[in-house]
Amino acid sequence: MADMPIPADIPLPLPLPAPVLAVILVALFVLHIVFVNLMLGGSLLAVTFEILGLKKPGYDRLAHHIAKTITVTKSLAVVLGVGPLLAINLLYTIPFYSANRITGAVWIMIIPLVTVAFLLTYLHKYTWERLARHKAIHITIGAMASLLFLVIPFIFLANVNLMQYPDRWEEARQGGFAAVLFMANVIPRYLHFVLAAVASTGLFLVWYLTREKAQVEEFPDESRASLRKRFYTVALVPTLIQFLAGPLVLITLPPVGLSGLMLAHLGAAVVLAAVVVRWMWLEIQEADNTPALSRRFWHIVIAMGVVVVLMATARQLYRATALKDFQAQSRQASVERQKKVAYYQAHPPAGAPKDPLEDIPGYSTFKANCMACHGLKDKLVGPSAVVMGQLYATPDGADAFVTWIRTTQNPRRFKAADEPPMKMPAYGPGQLDEAAVRGLHGFLIEVAKPKP
């Protein structure tokens, strides 16, 4: 990384402290990935059982019930995906957008691919009976949706993986998306994800198809015990394979992000997963003797949830460690750039036209901190300098303005047309001292005065 140019970070304050954003990122990602797993796993199992149903009709009815869940889990996966996407944009703006830029057209293809996948999912669900005599067509529709659900996470995973390794960006830029896909740890991580999706869905279907309110009589060839055995097995087998896939992921991870704390989280997850495997095996053995869901099922669900949280936390710890030096250098580059800008403003080259606003006290503060979102006369993200000056041109306007800058609680209401779509980030005394804020207020009052 020492030989690569480091882009300057964006000199804007975060809306929350970085550790708080990291916790939010992990929490929201866990919620998102649970429903992504159920969406992908449900799609794969629905198609699998529909194919098996060609010879045994009972499997077709089972596949239909599974397919009904996918449109629900799909919607929840999309809604819950917004939060972690925003959080990672805030925490890792430069790495994330750099990776997006490198993967380019393939990255943006996620949007049309998701759209087509969702349309195929609805088509597969709502043509079940209409295409009952054309199973080849119907299965093809479901298989195409499943294939897209497999491709989309692959693209996303490859992109998020790339952002962690700035030293590989030039290689990826020259080699294209194929170079990104075939980085050593992408395919093992993808296998780990797909196995988790099938295991999670198997456990979900144990509850969905054998709970007290489930209409088991819709499956004449099945009983609660047989369904429970089948889907505990669906959950157990990929979980066992994870004990091979997990170490493969760890072995192929570049050491740049490894830390003792991250490995401790992984170790705890492995131990707990082994306990879950034991419990699922006992549930399979005792299924014939337990007509209802046992208490052990909920122990399994809770333990699996803790495993997911531990794995997601380990993932974030690895990312933070891998990008620690890059982030620090990027912030330093931003500081150096602001120093150069300030020097240029204070010492303009000979013959350079002078900005007439330079002589107004407070203009330099406005230019450095506000101009990205507030135009002088035009609304950008927030209201213009003229509008703000008119609003705070009262005897107590300076104090009210300081309150707004410090707390984002605006004591003066803008007109609807000038109302910003989001709250402005607060500026503490460490960012703008009292004199700078009051000087900024004076500048706004000055530019708001009617000109002769």
Describe the role of every protein-language-model region.
Residues R337-T365:
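Electrostatic cytochrome c docking/interface patches
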Residues G375-T407:
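Gly/Gly-Pro-rich "capping" loops immediately C-terminal to redox-active cysteine motifs
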Residues P356-D378, T403:
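Sequence/structural segment immediately N-terminal to covalent heme-attachment motifs in c-type
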Residues T290-R319:
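Internal/C-terminal transmembrane anchor helices
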